[in-house]
Amino acid sequence: MTHPDPYLRGHGDTRYRVHHYDLQLTYAVVTNRLDERARLDVEVVEPTHHLKVDLRGLQLGGATVDGAPARYRRTSGGWSVAVGDRRAGERLVLELKVSGKPRPVPGTHGEAGWEELTDGSMVGSQPQGAPSWFPCNNDAADKATYRIEVLTDAHYQVVANGTRTVCERQ
């Protein structure tokens, strides 16, 4: 079920919450190409057999649930991933392969999200921009922790909120 928040119309799914996102991104600046693997540690809140994942403008190229291949299909504003019959309180790990050329997401107060610049890119995600660059449950009440790993062209710098644990140049 889509969340009723007026700022996030069509975003979010109240049947689950994400406890942690683990994102591995590879970004080619010149072509604005993003390839990523996203791992979502999920808790089911309401009985369901599928979850709606918010992802706008990017392709889903594979999905697993607890390591087993899962069926998925495009829906309005994202993707529906089959998770089998799940009861409230169950935990699962959803892994998704994503690719494409990210772009901002339109919303009630204008566009937000991934923005391609003349020499690089930036992300401004409030309130609806997160699905422009990673698969998520875009519900402002669904708080989670994140680990983000980014591989990009050597002469670019990756900047993000949080604590940097490793910075390698190759």
Identify the residue ranges that each predicted region occupies.
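Acidic/His-enriched low-complexity segments
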Residues: M1-Q170
